Amino acid sequence: MGANNGKQSGSEGKGSSSISSDLSSSTDQTSTKAPKNAATSEDSDLSMRTVSTPSPALILPPRSSSAVLNGSSTSSSTFGTETIAMVHMPPTSLTHPQRCLRQPRDQQGAPVDILPDHAFLQIFTHLPTNQLCRCARVCRRWYNLAWDPRLWRTIRLTGDVLHVDRALRVLTRRLCQDTPNVCLTVETVMVSGCRRLTDRGLYTVAQSCPELRRLEVAGCYNVSNEAVFEVVSRCPNLEHLDVSGCSKVTCISLTRDVSVKLSPLHGQQISIRFLDMTDCFALEDEGLHTIAAHCTQLTHLYLRRCVRLTDEGLRFLVIYCPGVRELSVSDCRFISDFGLREIAKLEGRLRYLSIAHCSRITDVGVRYVAKYCSRLRYLNARGCEGLTDHGIEHLAKSCLKLKSLDIGKCPLVSDAGLEQLALNSFNLKRLSLKSCESITGRGLQVVAANCFDLQLLNVQDCDVSLEALRFVKRHCKRCIIEHTNPAFF
């Protein structure tokens, strides 16, 4: 994947006449010792993949040298250590002068040639990238089929050294040949971990992929609000956005202004339902206010380690996004019981809540959630040191459909709280009590005797006897026990 109109670029290392020959050499031949900090041939096989629709091109690691055959460049000049995408011309007698493409008169075509195009496409959807590259070298028909846009609903690029901006530009340009300037079939772009991605790469996606529904740029710390604005403005069908680890992203809106007061909506909304802003450290209450006002259809929101958020930001969220089903504010140190009181206004719609390591939360806030969010299925309260047996009792009696509970590192939770949990939460499947200093084997036995469907129990760093662990194993036969007792196995 990489050049356009016959112009192709390569990288340092061996030159080759086609992308598939590079790939073949990486899988069929013994690789030589690579220089320090250089990507290996194995990396080239893994550096670009599609989730379910592999492509006949590859994001190649650094190589060198170039070759020109009859005026058509098949590799390019050196670009230092950067990795680029290559898109090669279909095999012809010009690009392969040593190979006779004309079959002998007495040789008939292979039986596979009688298959119709739609059968080939169905087969190609199941091939990995390197095999599809080899298929693209067979003949012009196979090359054209391998680049059929229907095989490109998903674009996935990985690699720290990948020149992802150029790869996206070349890919979208190649896929736009049948529909000038737009790739109508591309619905998913996944470039998480490509640290060299910049706003320029997202501009390319925004301009070329108007039907985009899912975008993942986790860990791409060079992405800013400007690029996100371009994507949400030009891709009206976007539903899933992952910008976790993008520390420069502080707002998602249809205007370039962070303040909601300076950005009138005029009836326009963003259709995002899933938003992950984990580790967006610069996000503040004002930014969350703007996000909530523009993304009113949110159902899944993850704000882990957004350390500047307070209870006020949660108030805005509940006002504009009443349909939130999953919410995580783990490690948000300024969130308190007042914030949980606002979250409780989501009532029966809330299914998943993570408040791990929110040290200001106590039984009071948990009581609000237990009273109004009776359909809660998952609660992570690990490290909430203010939580006691009273909070667990309210939770157990009100949230009867609770399936997963993490109360590890809650030193005030004891066997009394576990007894209330066991007598009410019969649907419990996952329970973590890691580092709960007040838990003993008596509480575990009560849980095991009542929660028969328990599938995972974490009692690491707990003062639990060997007999109690064996009791759990006898009564909960499908339960996986995570423990630190060397005598139990």
UniProtKB/Swiss-Prot annotation:
Pathway: Protein modification; protein ubiquitination. Residues 109-155 form the F-box domain. It is found in: Cytoplasm, Cytoskeleton, Microtubule organizing center, Centrosome. The lineage of its organism: Eukaryota, Metazoa, Chordata, Craniata, Vertebrata. Residues 1-31, 64-76 have a biased composition (Low complexity). Substrate recognition component of a SCF (SKP1-CUL1-F-box protein) E3 ubiquitin-protein ligase complex which mediates the ubiquitination and subsequent proteasomal degradation of target proteins. Residues 32-55 have a biased composition (Polar residues). It holds the Pfam family F-box-like. One of its GO terms (biological process) is protein ubiquitination. Belongs to the FBXL7 family. LRR repeats lie at residues 168-193, 194-219, 220-245, 251-279, 280-305, 306-331, 332-357, 358-383, 384-409, 410-435, 436-461. GO terms for cellular component: centrosome; cytoplasm; SCF ubiquitin ligase complex. This is F-box/LRR-repeat protein 7. Keywords: Cytoplasm, Cytoskeleton, Leucine-rich repeat, Repeat, Ubl conjugation pathway. The keyword Repeat applies. Part of the SCF (SKP1-CUL1-F-box) E3 ubiquitin-protein ligase complex SCF(FBXL7). Gene3D superfamilies: 1.20.1280.50, Ribonuclease Inhibitor. Residues 1-76 are annotated as: Disordered. It comes from Danio rerio (Zebrafish).
